Design a protein with these regions (language model features):
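Hydrophobic ligand-binding cavity/cleft-lining segments
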Residues: 1-41
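Short, Lys/Arg-enriched, disordered terminal segments
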Residues: 1-8, 128-136
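Short, surface-exposed coil-to-beta transition loops
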Residues: 1-4, 54-58, 78-84
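Structured loop/turn residues at secondary-structure junctions
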Residues: 8, 12, 49, 74-76, ...
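A short, structured loop/turn motif at beta-sheet edges
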Residues: 13, 62-66, 86-94
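Hydrophobic, Leu/Ile/Phe/Ala-enriched alpha-helical segments that form helix-helix packing faces
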Residues: 20-27, 123, 127, 131
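Glycine-rich portal/gate segments that line the openings of hydrophobic small-molecule binding cavities
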Residues: 28-31, 35-76
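Beta-strand/loop substructures that line and gate deep hydrophobic ligand-binding cavities in soluble
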Residues: 71-125, 132-134
Length: 136
């Protein structure tokens, strides 16, 4: 499954890099079924429920020219892997999601489109509030 979206924002690149490199900020906002995120250094472990099934997502945040969330997703014996890439420019974010695994059948285009459009619609305000909270 591949999904990409371009998001326009009023925030500068440096502030976006700081906030969007935090899995506790990004993951629950992009994937609403995620209810808990634990972070240790550049690794994350997220838990949630989707369609009555508990799942676990674990991976790493790679920081370079792009922000990359490389992850494994598991639930009830099913496994998948994916990558979320954020190309952050001044006032614009190109978001690319790639995933191959068991959840592809369940989440499909309907949920992913809804989640991504909701993330894009709310991002500017969510980042604004997070900048206030963190004093960035």
């Amino acid at each position: 499954m591949n999904k990409s979206i371009t998001i326009n924002t009023s925030h500068d690149r440096q502030s976006l890099l700081i906030i969007l490199s935090d899995p506790k900020f990004v993951l629950p906002k992009l994937f609403p079924p995620i209810k808990e995120v634990e972070v240790e250094n550049d690794s994350f472990n997220a838990h949630g429920r989707f369609m009555a099934m508990s799942f676990n997502m674990h991976g790493n945040v790679l920081r370079g020219a792009d922000l990359v969330y490389a992850f494994y997703l598991s639930a009830g014996g099913g496994m998948g892997q994916g990558k979320l890439t954020m190309r952050i420019k001044e006032r614009e974010i190109n978001l690319e999601f790639e995933y191959d695994g068991w959840m592809e059948r369940m989440s499909g285009i309907f949920f992913m489109d809804r989640w991504f459009s909701g993330f894009a619609r709310r991002l500017d305000e969510d980042v604004r509030m997070e900048r206030i909270k963190r004093k960035i």
